[in-house]
């Protein structure tokens, strides 16, 4: 199975108290067939992304810098990806040529919410980020989710602006 990053890097950061039917692992190339894109569409517009385009983007992300650490939770009962979040690590010249982490695309399937899968993903990514030596991890969220993310050490830190095209 082709993963987006080395699974052994992730293993020490996965909480041990997961139910047996949930497996935390890096995104795999065959997750297209396990509903990964459908899961992302619960978060935002995915656009026209067929399997060929997914696999092409997967390979580009797998081999590029910054490093994309996309983590999924698979339900072994249904063989579906039911939750996902990404830690993007970008290199900087500031902070002694340090690296910054950004948590992105946090999503839990609507039918699997309230099972603390989002918490599992965030704890995993924060632990992974620390081990990778990032000097900070940031994320953007809607105001309603500030209390949720603050449970994991995130603080409302500054204004965020965007341009969409």
UniProtKB/Swiss-Prot annotation:
The superkingdom of the source organism is: Eukaryota
From which source organism is this entry?
Caenorhabditis elegans
**Which PROSITE patterns would you find in this protein's record?**
GNAT (PS51186)
Q: Where does acetyl-CoA bind?
A: 114-119
- Which EC numbers characterise this protein's activity in its record? 2.3.1.4
Catalyzes what?
A: D-glucosamine 6-phosphate + acetyl-CoA = N-acetyl-D-glucosamine 6-phosphate + CoA + H(+)
Quote the record's binding site residues for substrate. Answer: 44, 92-95, 104-106, 135-136, 164
Keywords from the named record:
Acyltransferase, Transferase
A Pfam family recorded for this sequence? Acetyltransf_1
A biological process (GO) annotation for this entry? UDP-N-acetylglucosamine biosynthetic process
User: In the record, what terms sit under GO molecular function?
Assistant: glucosamine 6-phosphate N-acetyltransferase activity
| Alphabetized InterPro entries for the sequence | Acyl_CoA_acyltransferase, GNAT_dom, GNPNAT1-like
User: What is the name of this protein?
Assistant: Glucosamine 6-phosphate N-acetyltransferase
Q: What family is this?
A: Belongs to the acetyltransferase family. GNA1 subfamily.
The pathway entry for this protein reads as:
Nucleotide-sugar biosynthesis; UDP-N-acetyl-alpha-D-glucosamine biosynthesis; N-acetyl-alpha-D-glucosamine 1-phosphate from alpha-D-glucosamine 6-phosphate (route I): step 1/2
Q: What PANTHER family does the database record attribute to this sequence?
A: GLUCOSAMINE 6-PHOSPHATE N-ACETYLTRANSFERASE (PTHR13355:SF11)
Domain N-acetyltransferase, residue spans: 22-165
């Amino acid at each position: 199975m082709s993963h987006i990053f080395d699974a052994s890097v992730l293993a020490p950061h996965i909480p041990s108290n997961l139910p047996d039917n949930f497996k935390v692992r890096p995104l795999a190339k065959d997750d297209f067939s396990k509903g990964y894109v459908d899961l992302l569409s619960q978060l935002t517009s995915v656009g026209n992304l067929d399997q060929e385009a997914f696999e092409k983007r997967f390979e580009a992300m797998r081999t590029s810098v910054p490093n994309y650490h996309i983590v999924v939770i698979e339900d072994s009962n249904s063989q579906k990806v039911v939750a996902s979040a990404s830690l993007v690590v970008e290199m900087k010249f500031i902070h002694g040529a340090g690296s910054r982490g950004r948590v992105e695309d946090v999503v839990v399937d609507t039918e699997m919410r309230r099972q603390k899968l989002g918490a599992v993903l965030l704890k995993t990514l924060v632990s992974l980020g620390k081990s990778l030596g990032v000097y900070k991890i940031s994320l953007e969220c809607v105001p309603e989710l500030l209390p949720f993310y603050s449970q994991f050490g995130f603080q409302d830190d500054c204004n965020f602006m965007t341009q969409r095209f």
